Amino acid sequence: MPKLTWIGHSAFLLEDDEGNVVVIDPFIEDNPVTSVDPKSLKPSTILLTHAHNDHVGDTVDMAEWNDARVICTVELGDWLETQGVRDVVSGNHGGTIAFTGGTAKFTPAWHSSSYWDGQNRVAHGIPAGLIVRFGGRTFYFAGDTALFGDMRLIGDEGIDVAILPIGDHFTMGPDDAARAAEFVGAKTVIPCHYNTFPPIRQDPKAFRAKVGERAPEARVVILTPGESFDAG
């Protein structure tokens, strides 16, 4: 059964019993809440939700170190190729892409998608969420997003684990994230994208209480950076 590790912020690691390793939104080197060395991770696949620096993170280096495939939206993929990433497979909302050990389906996300290069902020297409089928389980990585009504349709995908941002300010906050948990109907909900920087300070236990009111059948698992969850 798959194991999900929260690296911190919105960066996650998925591993299965066959040795397949996937990294999602690998913001690691400059991530103030993690001690993980990005060189210690050996993914064959990197999944990206959008182009913001705190999600693209170490993608270019990790792809080179591991000869990893990067799966992302089209415009972000085009830009990554200009940065030297050799193996990019890009898609768009509604599309499903297979990778070693699983599949990733792009969903809508209400947010923006741009990269700050130190001088300019350049837009790279649209943001996305990801429905990831891996190790016999179905994960919903919402990415950075506001609440939206069509999350109810995502619930039709049979989500086992929903990973939802709760930080507010740049994404939905705890109240709307609890509604998202209700809409998606996942068995397990894991909060992310909080307590990395001052504007997104939140109490995950308060979020758990709100989910208990909205979706009492869901189990909220609060991880600390570096902690793993057995999705079996």
Range-by-range predicted roles:
Residues 13-52, 57-64, 75, 112-122, ...:
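Pre-active-site segment of Zn-dependent metallo-hydrolases
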Residues 23-26, 43-51, 71-74, 90, ...:
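Active-site neighborhood of phospho(di)ester-bond hydrolases with catalytic His/Asp-centered motifs
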Residues 57-115:
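Glycine/small-residue-rich loop that forms an oxyanion/phosphate-binding "nest" at active or ligand-binding sites
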Residues 3, 64-69, 137-139:
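Short active-site oxyanion
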Residues 30-31, 52-57, 77-80, 95-98, ...:
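Active-site environment of divalent metal-dependent phosphoester hydrolases
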Residues 1-21, 27-31, 98, 105, ...:
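Zn-dependent metallo-beta-lactamase
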Residues 69, 81-95, 178, 182-232:
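Binuclear metal-ion centers of metallo-dependent hydrolases, dominated by the metallo-beta-lactamase
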Residues 116-183:
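Active-site-proximal loop/helix segments of hydrolase catalytic cores
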